[in-house]
């Protein structure tokens, strides 16, 4: 009885609150959308990234190729099953919870459980979630295109 209650509590605990701490700056990218594409290119398919950004897959492909990324590589089922901690870490300072959940294809309960119970992840992430504005795709301006060429 106690173990069932404990499991129920663990599975229904809410996500930790966001802090007032701003996300880590990413001055080496033209904007957060470019950083998002760069960090997720080998881990998440373009369709999912586009869905999170409110873009078309072609937009994500164009951004990746403009920064010199090849492919995209095939995302195997093994990568989809095993890369979730890397995906969380790479996007912790880029995405609000809602978009992170959409990227992972998870529920709030799944993410909350993973943060608490999987490999001390909440501690490793600094025991806080910065307040990140939602990412929304917009076509890159001339300055962003120039920076894309420098990155490539």
Could you describe each region identified by the protein language model?
Residues 2-13:
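Bacterial N-terminal signal peptides
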């Amino acid at each position: 009885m106690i173990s069932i209650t404990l499991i129920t509590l663990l599975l229904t605990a809410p996500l930790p609150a966001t802090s007032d701490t701003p996300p880590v700056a990413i001055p080496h990218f033209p904007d957060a959308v470019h950083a998002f594409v760069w960090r997720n290119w080998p881990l998440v398919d373009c369709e999912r990234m586009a869905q999170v950004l409110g873009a078309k897959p072609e937009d994500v492909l164009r951004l990746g190729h403009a920064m010199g990324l090849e492919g995209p590589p095939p995302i195997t089922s093994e990568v989809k099953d095993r890369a979730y901690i890397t995906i969380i870490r790479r996007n912790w300072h880029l995405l609000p919870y809602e978009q992170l959940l959409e990227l992972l294809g998870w529920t709030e309960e799944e993410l909350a459980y993973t943060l608490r119970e999987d490999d001390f992840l909440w501690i490793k992430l600094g025991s806080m979630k910065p307040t990140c504005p939602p990412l929304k795709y917009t076509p890159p301006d001339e300055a962003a295109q120039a920076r894309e060429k420098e990155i490539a």
